[in-house]
Amino acid sequence: PPTQNSSPPQTTGAAVPFPAGISAQATGMPGLVALNRVRVTGFTQSDREVVARAENLDTGEHLEIACAYLVGCDGARSGIRRQIGARLHGDPIVQRVQSTVIRAPGLLPLIPGEPAWANFSLNPRRTGNMYAIDGRETWLIHNYLTPTETDFDDVDRDTCIRLILGVGPAFEYETIGTEDWIGRRLVADRFRDRRVFLCGDAAHIWVPMAGYGMNAGIADATNLSWQLAGVLEGWASPSILDAYEAERQPITDQVSRFAMDHAIALAAQRGAVPDSIEAPGPAGDAVRAQVGHAAYELNVNQYCCGGLNFGPFYDTSPIITHDGQTAPGYTMSDFTPSTVPGCRVPHLWLRDGRSLYDALGPGFTLLRRDRSVEVDGLVTAAAHRGVPLAVLDLDADDAETLYPHNLLLARPDQHVAWRGDQVPADPLALIDLIRGAASPFDALQPGFTE
């Protein structure tokens, strides 16, 4: 269904050149050095730093890179994960897939209906998906192996591609790249070892579904980055970093189960395609309509997945003020906006046309629904601890509907840290909790002042 009216707006699909764009953006950022063709071979860490050992793959030069913290974003085969002793747990085999990128200028005119980013091919002999890479001639073909096909070498790639595309031996295409892979549901039992952290596929692996893995990796990085920034800038206690694993590990386990359950449902549908789907005439038309409708109903939730993107909440976090109210549940496609601490800050459009998310500050933001509520005590407490805090008055039509309390404290990652109708009696205690220094010992650590 259309998602342009959702709040916040959602998009589907990510192009193959996406990583190149990210790389170009990163190389232009001040203070960031990108080392391409450099492989990290190991690291050592002490109480004060991490020293990564690396090798330039072109020159053979060996490098040592000293840093305060190291974040392993090195993918499913993560060497960082192995070195910190983290183990993957879950389901090692969910689906075997034979993937091929092809160039086929003659394919698009053969596809009925309006051009689509994704086409699902279901027939009794072979099922698979076709994804448009450039919208013209480059395609990604997924061939889903049957449960009895356990050896990729025994599956003829060309024959399967032609069965999925519905073309004969005369149809011409060029193979650009191939990859045989196994969809899994695995989550690391730890995301951290002292100064070393795991993010993205290094921490969790599941069947690729509508970018869930990419979104989860971005959420990992967003969560960890603001906490690291607080420590490095001096306003957060190092104890705040304990929140990363406490918050992200349960969420990635939940999302991994959504992805696996959906993959199992898709496999069941692929294994039950009736022979009559290719029958001519009204009888065949009826079967095709029925199978097509079932495929739509199953997959629309996969691609219109607002629930997985905006529904997860942190209910076991040590740096959130839980007030006893339970966060609403979510499904793959649906969620209920909520200000329960730990939830994503409910989105709304401000009267000046801005998205609320664009108006939030780079640090914490105190959202005030009622301008008459005094907030100086909390602002002063934040300044006393050096915590970056901005105040934003909610000038929006639906603020009272979405925000039942006068005040809400939004974290840098857009999750609710606290809510109330007035500033708490001890605002300094609240500030210490959200910066990971709730205990007196943490509050008096070097770099923090009373």
Annotate each PLM feature:
Residues 1-6, 24-31, 45, 163, ...:
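Helical substrate-recognition/capping region of FAD-dependent monooxygenase/halogenase enzymes
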